[in-house]
């Protein structure tokens, strides 16, 4: 035999071989259409018997294999069906002639033959020929199946006659010797009458009859004949035929034990996997459909069975274990003859199929190992491919996947052997793909991210390189790029540094002609190659969605607690948020992005390559919201370690946006990398809410930017910092420019301020503004600007605490000789005399010490769709103010004035600047102070009524202890006094001015002296008030009326009081004359009595006196000392001094 039939299985021994061939020129499509129709008739019940006749069809069969038909009858071509195309009667003779010629090739073994003509429209001239049938077309041939069944019936008749002829031979007749072609020369010269020769003839004929019985469906008879043949042939040591008899016995037993067959689907797969060269593959490929029989349909051997026959069958039939032993024995006998190599190989294949059914893989592997070592004649390349492919399929059948992959790879390499003129790269590529499972290699990159690596990486890399090379030789660059990308992605950890460089360079070379994409590649065989994202080029270790910058972060307007709950709801509001695991799964984070704003995602990436990795583009993959990403390009150093990369984009719609991954372009390969497929990835959440668009506000000021960064204790962040230098008490006007740089109108603006990080005590409002002029320009359209005027007013403590005198003495500076009308009494004193500071005592005594004030101006604004949804933004402006000292009040005291309702405030003012400075109070002349000079300033002021401040009802609600309440009262008193004084300073050379506040300067004693007494006393002479050095004129001898009024401004009732009027004369030399009984006389008593006076009530008492001589007289009104009035302070009983001038009536007439 020339070519082994690797598709053989044990049940083929019961089949009749029919060859179907084309005659003349006929299209393969038409031929195989009819071939499939014919081969579908594979089992027939002949002559209405219970036997089952099985047919095996081939469209190609070597003639030399037919010569082995006597050795095993299933190898004999007993039927021939020819298919021809004949459209006219003129071509019919020529077609029939060719049909006859093709019959000659198998004439020695043919039982019958048929010729099917297609396209013949007329009537055949010779109607007597039953072996020729014509049909109008290939589609209109419904009777083909019936004619094939009739043809099989005729084969059965011949077969049955031959069987009967062989079994009915008489014992005396000479039995012919059956032999195989290579045995002809071996029997020359042998004695045909010898007993040995006769036994050989008998044994071979018994074996031959067994084959015929098996083909005829008589299994029991076949078993009997096989057993007899084995005994006869064993006796004469006819090893090859003994092996055939044993194999026949095994086949009959397999048919009995395994009615489903041993070939089955595996046989189909084997036929389909036969790989040939490019042209021969196309020509012979349809032969894979030569699956002929379904041995499972065999249920009887055609003989009427009874219990005895069942017992006999069980006795003659081999057990499953005996079947394997007999196969081994048969194969060992085959091995004794080199010419029986093909028979030996096919027997091994059949045994393997049986062992596969029995699930005895190790035993099957021994048979397959024998197949490998069977030495056949010089095989063609096509036959080598077929042999290795079948070995691979058989190893796969028994579960030896890696061994199967090995032989399949050998077959693939054989397809492109150097000896082949036209290498079959497509067949090679197909076979290489089929080897992947055997080497634990999948073309899905997801399988390599699940746990540890499986398989031998070195072998897998070699196989992937071969796939790349085969793809390139096939002329499919996209396929080569896909496999090379897969190699680089999945085998990166096993590549050396040089291999990494080489693979990357090759990939860049391939992608320059055909870029790598994320589209799946569908192969002609139907296999789909999934995309290969480069999740390792670079490796991403963490993904973090970043919040917007501080100036752009949206905030939600806070509603009232439970405001959104329905009033009809039965549920009680609770601030406790229920734990929801679905939120963890969604990974939603607690800040928002804004529609239309640039949003950022930070990736920590790592370059595992030993060279600089260039990422041409890198962007985000999102879902849920329309997102416009802004591609980034980066270059990572070799083995860079973790490297931060920020990817940005702009959400164009609102809703929930989920960052699913990122896409890259590396080495010409475009990759979509999903976060779910990244092992060991850390992220802070992938889903964020995108709220409606908001305007963007940009502010700029006339002040320079500050190098000081404000860090409020509250944690607020300040976006812009400016600084300014001011003198204490100075006010700075700042113009803030508000520009809408967004795409939405600015509709709402709120401005607030607060002071931070300062230990200095300041007075008044640090920052003030009027928002109405700015709001009048709203809504502010995109690109428009508005202005806001803000006043920075620094008013720190102007006192020098180290030298603030606690006594109210005049310090030796007399002012009694100055005119009362002058508001300023000043004496220039050296700085040493005033002793403002002992510079060696404290560092804080340095008058030039610069203090710092810091404040934040917060702009809360909104507009557009975001405003409708209740969102706003905050923009903060940080102010750093360096406050230089201007003036200090080193000493403060008071002097009584001529009026009981006035007093003099005395200030020692020190100029701590390096410039000449002027200072003045309201509507008064200026006092000039040189640098470092200290002067005293006296200001006459009306006393203050602090009762309204002291009784403020809301104070106790804002303070926690009495000390705080008292401090606030004192501050309020100082504020009122400061507003009345209006002291201001000015530096003419710098054109700068400011306020000098006395709020922190006045101590409690000074405040008491400035406070208007609760009991207000008024003295009137002849109805005219006597106060402020006023002189009342009267005539000698004329009585004058004296009226004393008391107004009770205290909270309690006072009185009764007794007041005594004592007149005296002042000689202006310190001597007072009280002995005036002969000069002044009273009309009535000189004592006035005032009863109890209720709060806010008034009491008046009247008297009169008479002056008998001219002169200047003074009236001293004193209270009688009694116990009832000692509880009231003496300051409450300050009555004005009364100055009366008595003139002579004659002198007045003369004037």
From Swiss-Prot:
<comment type="function">
    <text>Functions as an activator of NF-kappa-B through increased phosphorylation of the IKK complex. May function in neuronal cells differentiation. May play a role in vesicular transport from endoplasmic reticulum to Golgi.</text>
</comment>
<protein>
    <recommendedName>
        <fullName>Trafficking protein particle complex subunit 9</fullName>
    </recommendedName>
</protein>
<dbReference type="GO" id="GO:0005802">
    <property type="term" value="C:trans-Golgi network"/>
</dbReference>
<keyword id="KW-0221">Differentiation</keyword>
<keyword id="KW-0256">Endoplasmic reticulum</keyword>
<dbReference type="GO" id="GO:0030154">
    <property type="term" value="P:cell differentiation"/>
</dbReference>
<dbReference type="GO" id="GO:0005783">
    <property type="term" value="C:endoplasmic reticulum"/>
</dbReference>
<dbReference type="InterPro" id="IPR013935">
    <property type="entry name" value="TRAPP_II_complex_Trs120"/>
</dbReference>
<dbReference type="Pfam" id="PF08626">
    <property type="entry name" value="TRAPPC9-Trs120"/>
</dbReference>
<comment type="similarity">
    <text>Belongs to the NIBP family.</text>
</comment>
<keyword id="KW-0333">Golgi apparatus</keyword>
<keyword id="KW-0963">Cytoplasm</keyword>
<comment type="subunit">
    <text>Part of the multisubunit TRAPP (transport protein particle) complex.</text>
</comment>
């Amino acid at each position: 035999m020339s070519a082994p039939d690797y598709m053989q299985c044990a049940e083929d021994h019961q089949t009749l071989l029919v060859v179907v061939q084309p005659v003349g020129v006929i299209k393969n499509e038409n031929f195989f259409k009819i071939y499939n129709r014919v081969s579908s008739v594979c089992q027939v019940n002949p002559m209405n018997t219970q036997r089952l006749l099985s047919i095996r069809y081939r469209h190609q069969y070597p003639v030399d294999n037919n010569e082995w038909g006597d050795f095993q009858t299933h190898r004999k071509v007993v039927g021939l069906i020819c298919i021809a195309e004949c459209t006219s009667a003129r071509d019919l003779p020529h077609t029939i002639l060719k049909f006859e010629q093709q019959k000659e090739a198998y004439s020695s073994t043919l039982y019958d033959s048929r010729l099917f003509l297609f396209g013949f429209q007329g009537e055949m001239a010779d109607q007597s020929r039953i072996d020729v049938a014509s049909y109008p077309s290939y589609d209109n041939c419904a009777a083909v199946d019936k004619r094939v069944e009739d043809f099989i019936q005729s084969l059965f008749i011949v077969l049955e006659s031959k069987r009967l002829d062989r079994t009915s031979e008489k014992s005396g007749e000479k039995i012919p010797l059956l032999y195989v072609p290579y045995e002809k020369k071996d029997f020359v010269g042998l004695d045909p009458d010898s007993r040995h020769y006769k036994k050989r003839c008998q044994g071979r004929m018994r074996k031959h009859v067994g084959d015929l019985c098996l083909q005829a469906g008589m299994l029991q008879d076949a078993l009997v004949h096989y057993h007899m043949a084995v005994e006869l042939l064993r006796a004469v040591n006819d090893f090859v035929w003994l092996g055939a008899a044993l194999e026949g016995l095994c086949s009959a037993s397999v048919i009995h034990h395994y009615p489903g067959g041993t070939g089955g689907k595996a046989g189909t797969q084997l036929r389909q996997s036969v790989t040939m060269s490019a042209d021969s593959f196309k020509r012979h490929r349809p032969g894979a459909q030569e699956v002929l029989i379904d041995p499972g349909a065999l249920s009887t051997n055609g003989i009427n069975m009874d219990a005895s026959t069942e017992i006999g069958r069980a006795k003659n039939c081999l057990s499953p274990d005996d079947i394997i032993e007999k196969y081994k024995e048969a194969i060992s006998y085959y091995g004794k003859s080199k010419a029986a190599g093909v028979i030996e190989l096919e027997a091994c294949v059949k045994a393997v199929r049986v062992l596969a059914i029995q699930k005895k893989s190790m035993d099957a592997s021994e048979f397959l190992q024998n197949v490998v070592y069977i030495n056949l004649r010089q095989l063609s390349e096509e036959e080598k491919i077929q042999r290795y492919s079948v070995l691979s399929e058989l190893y796969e059948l028994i579960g030896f996947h890696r061994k199967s992959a090995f032989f399949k790879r050998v077959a693939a390499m054989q397809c492109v052997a150097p000896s082949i003129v036209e290498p079959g790269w497509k067949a090679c590529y197909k076979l290489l793909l089929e080897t992947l499972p055997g080497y634990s290699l999948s073309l899905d990159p997801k399988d390599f991210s699940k746990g540890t690596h499986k398989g031998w990486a070195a072998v897998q890399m070699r196989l992937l390189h071969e796939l790349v090379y085969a793809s390139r030789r096939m002329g499919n660059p996209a396929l080569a790029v896909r496999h090379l990308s897969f190699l680089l992605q999945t085998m990166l950890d096993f590549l050396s540094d040089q291999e990494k460089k080489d693979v990357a360079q090759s990939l860049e070379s391939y992608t320059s002609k055909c870029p790598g994409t994320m589209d799946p590649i569908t192969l002609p065989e139907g296999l789909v190659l999934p995309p290969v994202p480069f999740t390792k080029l670079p490796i991403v270790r963490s993904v973090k969605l970043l919040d917007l910058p501080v100036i752009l972060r949206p905030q939600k307007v806070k509603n009232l607690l439970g405001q959104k709950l329905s009033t009809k709801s039965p549920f009680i509001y609770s601030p406790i948020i229920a734990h929801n695991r679905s939120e963890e799964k969604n990974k939603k984070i607690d800040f928002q992005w804004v529609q239309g704003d640039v949003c950022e995602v930070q990736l920590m990436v790592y370059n595992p390559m030993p060279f600089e990795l260039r990422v041409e583009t890198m962007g985000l993959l999102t879902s849920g919201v329309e997102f416009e990403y802004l591609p980034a390009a980066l270059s990572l150093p070799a083995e860079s370690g973790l490297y931060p990369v920020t990817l940005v984009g702009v959400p164009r719609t609102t809703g929930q946006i989920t960052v699913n991954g990122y896409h890259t372009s590396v080495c010409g390969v475009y990759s979509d990398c999903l976060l779910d497929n990244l092992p060991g990835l850390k992220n802070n959440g992938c889903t964020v809410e995108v709220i409606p668009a908001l305007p963007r506000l940009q502010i700029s000021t006339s002040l320079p930017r500050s190098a000081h960064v404000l860090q409020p204790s509250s944690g607020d962040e300040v976006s812009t910092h400016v600084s300014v230098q001011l003198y204490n008490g100075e006010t700075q006007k700042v113009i803030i420019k508000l520009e809408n740089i967004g795409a939405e109108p600015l509709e709402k603006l709120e401005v607030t301020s607060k002071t931070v990080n300062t230990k200095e005590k300041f007075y008044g409002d640090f920052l003030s503004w009027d928002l109405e002029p700015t709001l009048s320009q709203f809504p502010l359209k995109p690109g428009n600007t508005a202005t806001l005027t803000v006043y920075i007013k620094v008013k720190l403590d102007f006192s020098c605490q180290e030298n603030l005198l606690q006594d109210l003495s005049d310090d030796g500076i007399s002012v009694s000789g100055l005119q009362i009308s002058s508001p300023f009494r000043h004496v220039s004193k050296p700085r040493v005399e005033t002793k403002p500071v002992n510079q060696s005592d404290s560092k804080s005594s340095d008058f030039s010490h610069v203090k710092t004030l810091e404040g934040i101006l917060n702009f809360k604004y909104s507009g557009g769709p975001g405003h409708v949804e209740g969102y706003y933004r905050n923009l903060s402006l940080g102010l750093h103010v360096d406050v230089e000292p201007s003036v200090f009040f080193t000493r403060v005291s008071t002097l009584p004035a001529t009026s009981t309702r006035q007093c003099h405030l005395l200030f020692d003012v020190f100029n701590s600047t390096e410039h000449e400075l002027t200072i003045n109070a309201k509507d008064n002349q200026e006092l000039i102070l040189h640098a470092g000079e200290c002067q005293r300033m006296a200001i006459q002021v009306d006393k203050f009524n602090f009762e309204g401040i002291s009784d403020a009802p809301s104070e106790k609600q804002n303070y926690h202890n009495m000390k705080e309440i008292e401090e606030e009262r004192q501050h309020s008193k100082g504020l009122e006094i400061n507003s009345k004084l209006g002291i201001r300073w000015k530096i003419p050379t710098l054109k700068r001015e400011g306020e000098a506040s006395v709020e922190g300067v006045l101590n409690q004693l000074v405040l008491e002296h400035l406070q208007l007494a609760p009991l207000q006393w008024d003295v009137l002479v002849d109805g005219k008030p006597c106060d402020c050095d006023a002189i009342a004129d009267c005539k000698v001898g004329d009585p004058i009326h004296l009226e004393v009024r008391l107004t009770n401004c205290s909270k309690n009732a006072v009185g009764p009081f007794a007041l005594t009027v004592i007149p005296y004369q002042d000689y202006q030399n310190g001597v007072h004359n009280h002995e005036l009984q002969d000069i002044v006389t009273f009309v009535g008593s000189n004592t006035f009595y005032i009863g109890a006076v209720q709060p806010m009530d008034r009491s008046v008492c009247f008297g009169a006196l008479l002056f008998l001589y001219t002169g200047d007289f003074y009236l001293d009104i004193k209270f009688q000392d009694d116990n009832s009035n000692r509880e009231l302070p003496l300051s409450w009983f300050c009555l004005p001094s009364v100055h009366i001038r008595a003139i002579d009536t004659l002198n007045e007439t003369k004037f």
